[in-house]
Amino acid sequence: MLEGAVKRTLYELKWRLHHPAAFDKYRRVLANETVSPDELLARQEAARRRIVRTAMEKTAFYPKFYGAVGFEAGDSGKEGWFERLPVVTKRELRERRDGFVNPERRSSLRWFTTGGSTGEPVKTGFDESLCEEVYNWRLLNRFGVHPWDDHAYLWRDLRPRRIAKLINAAMWWPTRHLKCDVSSLDEAGIRAFLGDCRRLRPTLIYGYVGALAQVARFVLERSGKSGEGPGGAEGWRPKMVWSTSAPLSAVQRKMIETAFGAPVCDEYGSCECRWIAAQCPECKGLHVNVEHVHLEFLGDDGRAVERGEYGRTVITNLEDEAFPLIRYENNDRGRWLVDPCACGRTLPCIDSVKGRESESFVLPSGKVVSGEYLTTLFDARPDLVRGFRVVQHRDASITVEYVPAKGRDEGERRMAEALSGLVRVVGGEVPVAFKPVREIPHDRGKLRFVVREK
């Protein structure tokens, strides 16, 4: 108890020195979880007007961009005004990036480059003075985890020099952060990570989906051997596992939860706009951080799709006045959930992101097999496999690679039965093969389970 109190006191002291308003903002976002939906909508409308006004007055890009469609600052009071604004694409962001900068806030601007998983890496900016960390704290609070607790990370190590690691550890002291570099994670690295976890006993394990799945698979394959699991003989379990950076399939969720003995929280964000949405312990959808971001899902006609239908994801960062990003299409696909969450929180929910537009398959007839469908192939039978990915080859043929569940290699006939829906969708246009493999490869911890060969 004393150690926890010391950690909390020092953690809060550091944040108050670094960002005096951080905990006031945190209390506000916690209270927002029970604000009425109508009040949340009204606040979002005011925030949209404010960020659009700032963008038109302070940046070089938006006045010309909106002027091209006849939109003026005074139009924000008219019905449907926001939907009239043109959508910003990755191309505009990449080619006209400097025009998005508010010169009055340049001193607080930090640059970040997206990973380019869609083939279009983009450099974007964000205001580091906003204290977006409060959305992290709110998420942890839902699972009974504190930001000053000891945490473990399966992540790419961006501080290769020893001095940088020592400085980072000193900044966080006495809170300890166990970090495992997943850039090239092997069996020895996994054993070392699990051993460190047993000693440190972190309340949270945070990581890329691919790395979490790799460690979970290792644990399950050796679950009968003494001391090989996360807790070993000590019986330690984290309070939560936090998955990020890629869609989380039902197969992966089941495997990770079984291996670590803890609920898995799926979180959605992007390099262009972090902290978009995250799950609660109900794990039925992701609550949107409506104070921070406005979400839209659009059809091919540019209009909002019906609630429950999938559409192109368009995001507006409501807080960042240093680098306003308004109605930005990030190439993901998603949808609003129809029913409210059973947890009682009033923050609206979206479904887990099912796939990017670039991950859809195109058949010879021109028919498109959507990425959001392909990511759910084993949702009805997650017990059959420990992992999978679907590959469309250059000749348009499709191969489903899967890691059989322990002791359950069903063979191609059983797999064909389980995946009869895919065969039916393809309709005989191209061959569909099923291939058991030892593991599904990941790229430095990030997992792509829908792949279209170029």
Locate each region found by the language model.
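Hydrophobic alpha-helical segments, especially N-terminal targeting/anchoring helices
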Residues: 298-299, 362, 441
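Nucleotide 5′-phosphate-binding alpha/beta core
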Residues: 1-113, 119-132, 137-150, 157, ...
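Conserved AMP-binding/adenylate-forming
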Residues: 248-340, 357
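Adenylate-forming
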Residues: 183-189, 202-224, 234-253, 266-272
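AMP-binding/adenylate-forming catalytic core of the ANL superfamily
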Residues: 205, 319-428
